[in-house]
């Protein structure tokens, strides 16, 4: 059976062997609700008898950083000269309790992606690029890869519910520890690695049968609530002599409550992963119908930290859909201390390369469709464990491309900060932006472009009260 039929890919063969669905009928013949994608989805489920699985992220359009724009300096404020005035990017994470906080040369990190979801070459390339950039990279479900540790100057070690590949010795080898309680692509569920990627090496590292789907548990065996999480964090601190910062990573769901509980448990850093976050494999239904967007989650998280009076003391890293320097700048302006990238780094490395178009088509996909990652047949050699495919990925070239991309992303971030008159990217603030949509204005509390009115619920309530008071006074 072809890969698309096995995995439930878009363009699954029908009973005649033809791929896909007939041409879309005219709008008057078929209501918009029952469009091509919906029909194809139903046909696929009817063929497979189960939900569909894909890699990548949601395809839905949600409120995002693109709905905000910067308003740079002109006459009322002075911008900085890019060629002679510095704009600082140095970022410190985890100084709340750790003796050795993480010091980044720029407010960007590489998100957790496992050896298993990615090839050994891809993981090593990420570590090499991060070292040159002066930023951190992160392990993933399945433990620490020796080559990744050697390549990475700053490595964050994830502690996950599965305990796959977990080694107490690796805690001391890491530069920071990240307790993962969820991710934006599939909050409320555990990790998923399809059997096609469970090679002999992966099976040995995770103590699993070769070629069998691996479904990670969703709840940590060591704690069942925030009080237990506090005990776990203290155990991790003791195991590392109180040197390593402890992060808590969560999917963007009940953000305010979760943030407050994580802070109470002693987290030094919160990593908040929004709906747009990608993954190696997930049920499609979770990608499209769970979690809240990154921008919305960030605003709620900042508000929660402000209520606890720990904004700035507990650092906030956001991920999910960060694709360029403008997204990073807007996240920092809204209150984040740093951003984390995953899909952007893999794309820079060479994922979805058009030169492999024929192979994508044979699998029922198009180049640029990162939902192929779960199949284990990624022709670029990035999201695969097939030796002949991995051999296509040149280690040095992959690392160089990630280095170039993040360097360019940093220049974009600095350019926007200078245009707003800021000598440090962390000085960006909401006042430097305007909202381009009503939704974005309501979510962020930033005035709609062309107005000075903040379309937030509190502001609307105050405005209504003012009008009512004015009406009463006029009547009197």
What function would you assign to each model-found segment?
Residues 165, 187-189, 194-215, 219, ...:
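Hydrophobic, small-residue-rich alpha-helical packing segments that form membrane-like cores
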Residues 178-180, 186-208, 374-387, 413:
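Mobile "lid/hinge" segments at catalytic clefts and subdomain interfaces of large enzymes
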Residues 134-135, 174, 267, 336, ...:
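A structural motif
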Residues 108-111, 135-139, 155-159, 175-179, ...:
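Hydrophobic faces of well-ordered beta-strands that scaffold small-molecule active sites
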Residues 217-390:
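Glycine-rich phosphate/ribose-binding loops and adjacent secondary-structure elements
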């Amino acid at each position: 059976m072809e890969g698309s039929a096995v995995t439930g890919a878009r363009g699954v063969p029908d009973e005649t062997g033809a791929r896909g669905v007939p041409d879309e009928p005219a709008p008057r013949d078929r209501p918009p609700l029952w469009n091509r994608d919906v029909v194809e989805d139903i046909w696929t489920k009817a063929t497979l008898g189960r939900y569909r699985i894909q890699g990548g992220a949601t395809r839905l359009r949600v409120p995002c950083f693109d709905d905000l724009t910067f308003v740079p300096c002109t006459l009322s404020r002075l911008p900085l000269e890019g060629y002679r005035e510095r704009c600082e990017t140095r970022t410190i994470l985890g100084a709340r309790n750790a003796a050795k906080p993480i010091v980044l040369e720029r407010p960007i990190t590489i998100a957790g992606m496992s050896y298993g979801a990615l090839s050994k070459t891809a993981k090593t390339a990420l570590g090499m690029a991060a070292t040159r950039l002066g930023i951190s990279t992160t392990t993933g479900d399945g433990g620490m890869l020796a080559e990744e540790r050697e390549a990475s100057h700053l490595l964050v070690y994830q502690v996950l519910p599965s305990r796959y590949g977990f080694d107490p010795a690796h805690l001391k080898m890491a530069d920071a520890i990240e307790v993962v309680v969820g991710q934006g692509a599939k909050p409320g569920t555990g990790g998923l690695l399809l059997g096609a990627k469970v090679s002999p090496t992966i099976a040995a590292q995770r103590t699993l049968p070769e070629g069998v789907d691996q479904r990670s548990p969703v709840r940590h065996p060591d704690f069942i609530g925030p009080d237990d999480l506090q005990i776990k964090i203290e155990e991790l601190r003791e195991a590392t002599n109180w040197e390593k910062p402890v992060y808590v990573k969560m999917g963007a769901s009940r953000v305010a409550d979760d943030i407050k509980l994580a802070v109470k448990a002693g987290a030094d850093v919160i990593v908040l992963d929004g709906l747009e976050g990608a993954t190696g494999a997930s049920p499609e239904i979770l990608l499209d119908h769970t979690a809240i967007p990154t921008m919305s989650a960030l605003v709620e998280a900042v508000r929660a930290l402000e209520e606890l009076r720990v904004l700035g003391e507990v650092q906030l890293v956001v991920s999910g859909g960060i694709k360029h320097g403008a997204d990073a700048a807007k996240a920092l302006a809204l209150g984040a201390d740093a951003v984390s990238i995953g899909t952007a780094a893999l794309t820079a490395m060479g994922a979805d390369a058009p030169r492999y178009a024929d192979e994508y088509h044979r699998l029922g996909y198009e180049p640029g469709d990162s939902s192929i990652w779960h199949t284990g047949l990624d022709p670029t050699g990035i999201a695969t464990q097939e030796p002949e495919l991995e051999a296509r990925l040149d280690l040095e070239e992959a690392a160089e491309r990630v280095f170039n991309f993040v360097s360019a992303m940093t220049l974009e971030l600095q350019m926007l900060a200078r245009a707003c008159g800021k000598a440090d990217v962390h000085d960006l603030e909401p006042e430097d932006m305007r909202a381009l949509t009503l939704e974005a204005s309501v979510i962020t509390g930033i005035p709609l472009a062309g107005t000075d009115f903040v379309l937030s619920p509190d502001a609307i309530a105050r405005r209504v009260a003012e009008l009512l008071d004015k009406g009463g006074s006029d009547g009197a």
